[in-house]
C-alpha cells in the first residue's frame, strides 16, 4: 500500500470511494501487507547488509489483516462511514460462479480468491537484520489517507 495503490487494492479503494464496492463480511482470512515506504527501507537494508548473502527475504508490516479490516481502513481513509450491514459471502460466491460462466463480467473465482483467500507471510528473518516497519495499514491511511484518496 502507498499513495498510489495498484491492482486489486486500487480497484477496492476506488470502489469504496465511488460508493459501488459492497461492504465485505468478516471472514477472518489473513493477509500480509507492507507500505511501499517500508518496502524500500527493507530493500536498502538487505542490499547493504553483508549477512544477507543472496538470501531471499519476505517483507511485511507484521500485521495480519482480514479483508474486512482492509475494507474498514479504506472506508476511514475515504471519509466514508463503515456500513453496519455487510454483503453475505454467498453473494460473492454466486457472483464469482456467474463470472466464471459469463466471461465479460469482471468478477470471477480468481477475484473471489483474491478477496477472501489467505495470503499471510512472516518477515521474522528480515526483523533479525534489524528491520522494523514504520507503518501498518491503519496508521498509514490515518496519516496519508487524504493523499491516497486524491491520487487514486
Predicted regions located by residue number:
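Conserved beta-loop-beta element that borders a ligand/cofactor-binding pocket
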Residues: 1-3
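A short C-terminal helix-loop "cap" of Rossmann-like NAD(P)-dependent dehydrogenase/epimerase domains
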Residues: 13-24, 80
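Short, glycine/charged-enriched secondary-structure capping and boundary segments
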Residues: 7-15, 72-74, 100
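Mid/C-terminal beta-alpha module of Rossmann-like enzyme folds, strongest
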Residues: 45, 49-107, 135-152
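Substrate-positioning beta->alpha
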Residues: 5-11, 25-47, 54-55
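Conserved C-terminal active-site "lid" loop/helix of NAD(P)H-dependent oxidoreductases
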Residues: 36, 95-132
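Residues in well-ordered alpha-helical elements
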Residues: 10, 37-40, 66-69, 124, ...
Amino acid at each position: 500500500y502507498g499513495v498510489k495503490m495498484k491492482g486489486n487494492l486500487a480497484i477496492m479503494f476506488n470502489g469504496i470511494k465511488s460508493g459501488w464496492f459492497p461492504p465485505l463480511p468478516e471472514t477472518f482470512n489473513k493477509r500480509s501487507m507492507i507500505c511501499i515506504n517500508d518496502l524500500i527501507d527493507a530493500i536498502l537494508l538487505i542490499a547493504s547488509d553483508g549477512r544477507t548473502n543472496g538470501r531471499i527475504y519476505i517483507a511485511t508490516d507484521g500485521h495480519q489483516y482480514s479483508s474486512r479490516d482492509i475494507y474498514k481502513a479504506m472506508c476511514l481513509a475515504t471519509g466514508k462511514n463503515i456500513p453496519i450491514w455487510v454483503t453475505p459471502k454467498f453473494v460473492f460466491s454466486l457472483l464469482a460462479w456467474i463470472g466464471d460462466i459469463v466471461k465479460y463480467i469482471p468478477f470471477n473465482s480468481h477475484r473471489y480468491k483474491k478477496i477472501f483467500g489467505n495470503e499471510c507471510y512472516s518477515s521474522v528473518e528480515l526483523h533479525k537484520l534489524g528491520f522494523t516497519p514504520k507503518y501498518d495499514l491503519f496508521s498509514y491511511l490515518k496519516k496519508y489517507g487524504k493523499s491516497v484518496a486524491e491520487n487514486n
